[in-house]
């Protein structure tokens, strides 16, 4: 343990926490334009074709963003909203696109967990 004299000479320094989503610059979401929409494969042991988009943000950053849900309408030059949140089995993907905002449509025929996929409440058929 340090003596009081040592602490007077050289005080304790707080460890700065590094952000997991630096491109957001402390904002909850950011707007951007898709520069490329493509599919990629996850790390072992998983197997799929994951839908991702390369997005140029309004602050100049270019990031890779995951497109969640079944089916999407994104193409090059689509304007999207991205939020933080990584995809564990896709290296380098630290952001998610927000479904149901700007040019991104919500997921069709979704009944549960709709708020996460930008889907409106279905009309009751009686």
Curated annotation (Swiss-Prot):
> Which GO MF terms does the UniProt record name?
rRNA binding; structural constituent of ribosome; tRNA binding
Residues bearing 3-methylthioaspartic acid are 89
Q: Which cysteines are joined by disulfide bonds?
A: none
Q: Which InterPro entries match?
A: NA-bd_OB-fold, Ribosomal_uS12, Ribosomal_uS12_bac
Q: Which intervals carry biased composition (Basic residues)?
A: 113-126
Matching Pfam families, A to Z?
Answer: Ribosom_S12_S23
Taxonomically, the superkingdom here is Bacteria
Q: Which UniProt keywords apply?
A: Methylation, Ribonucleoprotein, Ribosomal protein, RNA-binding, rRNA-binding, tRNA-binding
Biological processes, Gene Ontology terms:
translation
The yes or no answer to whether the keyword ATP-binding is present is no
tRNA-binding listed as a keyword: yes
Q: What does this protein do?
A: With S4 and S5 plays an important role in translational accuracy.
Which family is this protein grouped under? Belongs to the universal ribosomal protein uS12 family.
**What is the protein's given name?**
Small ribosomal subunit protein uS12
Q: Which organism is it from?
A: Legionella pneumophila subsp. pneumophila (strain Philadelphia 1 / ATCC 33152 / DSM 7513)
């Amino acid at each position: 343990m340090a003596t009081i004299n040592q602490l007077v000479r050289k005080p304790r320094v707080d460890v700065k926490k590094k952000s997991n989503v630096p491109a957001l610059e402390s904002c909850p979401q950011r707007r951007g334009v898709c520069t490329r929409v493509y599919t990629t494969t996850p790390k072992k042991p998983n197997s799929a074709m994951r839908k991702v988009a390369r997005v140029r943000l309004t602050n100049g950053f270019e990031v890779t963003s995951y497109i969640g849900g079944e089916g999407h309408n994104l193409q090059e030059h689509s304007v999207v909203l991205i939020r933080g949140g990584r995809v564990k089995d896709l290296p380098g993907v630290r952001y998610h696109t927000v479904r149901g905002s700007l040019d991104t449509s919500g997921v069709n025929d979704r009944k549960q967990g709709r708020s996460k996929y930008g889907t409106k409440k279905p009309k009751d058929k009686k």
